[in-house]
Amino acid sequence: MQKESISFIILAAGKGSRMRSNTPKVLHSLAGEPIIFHILRKILSLSNKITLKKIIIVLGHESELVKKDISSNFSGINFAIQDKQYGTAHAVLSAKDLLINTRGKVIVLCGDTPLISIKLMLDLIKLSKNVDLGVSVFKTLNPFGYGRVILNKLNKVFSIIEEKDANKSQKSINLCNTGIYISDISLLFKLLSLVKFNSNKKEMYLTDIV
């Protein structure tokens, strides 16, 4: 059986200001090493199950420091720079040039999710054989702060509403977005080209590709 060709975009440009630390968020330590290292090790462990094409890490805050730490411990990692913090869709677009000649599918995830499981990534890859765009979701008793997932009558994801944009009814929804997606590379950037810049919030939401 032919292995799926998969690339990864890891979003790691944020400052992590809520941590009240000068250390870049993805370099905070968990079990003795930076949290992004845990993600990279899990991705690399998939190489016997998939054709791993590219790993791209989108950097912003303290980019040289993050790049140095990662490059000292891992080889073959690509880096893209998000110069201005214009949201998650803008961050993914920063990686476009590095994937322009790459075929296959891409998983997009955040660099502060060290507990992501190998099983979840494999489940997404399996899901992508039957859908154009796959989104990982979860249910929680306390959905505050997460994007709410709206389903259609066929129980498919219809849209994702960010917490700050949700009305009272939408805020009661307990099905939430993990921020992990899978799509064909060319389709992802086609969808991103349709995402509009929100001039009031100075952001482009990745959730708008749904």
List PLM regions with ranges.
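Short aromatic/basic micro-patch
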Residues: 29, 115, 182
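Short catalytic helix/loop segments, enriched in acidic residues and glycine
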Residues: 22-40
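Conserved beta-strand segments of alpha/beta enzyme cores
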Residues: 26, 76-78, 156
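Rossmann-like NAD(P)H-binding beta-loop-alpha module
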Residues: 103, 140-169
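Conserved donor-nucleotide/metal-binding helix-loop-beta segment in metal-dependent transferases, i.e.
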Residues: 119-144
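Catalytic-core segments of class I nucleotidyltransferases/pyrophosphorylases
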Residues: 157-210
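Conserved N-terminal catalytic core of the sugar/cofactor nucleotidyltransferase
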Residues: 2-7, 34-109, 115-123
